[in-house]
Structures are given as C-alpha cells and as structure tokens.
Amino acid sequence: FIGGIISFIKKLF
C-alpha cells in the first residue's frame, strides 16, 4: 500500500 511505498523510498534515501 502507499505507506509501504513511502517506507521503501525513505529506505533508499
């Protein structure tokens, strides 16, 4: 879901 995508992006940065 959206929250998972945001967490994934935060992990990249």
Swiss-Prot record:
UniProt keyword terms in alphabetical order: Antibiotic, Antimicrobial, Cytolysis, Hemolysis, Secreted
Presence of keyword Secreted = yes
Q: Where in the cell is it found?
A: Secreted
The family assignment reads:
Belongs to the grammistin family. Group 2 subfamily.
Q: Enumerate the Gene Ontology biological process terms.
A: defense response to bacterium; killing of cells of another organism
Which coarse location class describes where this protein primarily resides? secreted
Gene Ontology CC terms, in alphabetical order:
extracellular region
Q: What does this protein do?
A: Has lytic and hemolytic activities. Has antibacterial activity with a broad spectrum against various species of bacteria including both Gram-positive and Gram-negative groups.
This chain's protein is named: Grammistin Gs E
Tissue specificity statement from the Swiss-Prot or TrEMBL entry = Expressed by the skin glands.
Coiled-coil features, chain-numbered ranges: none
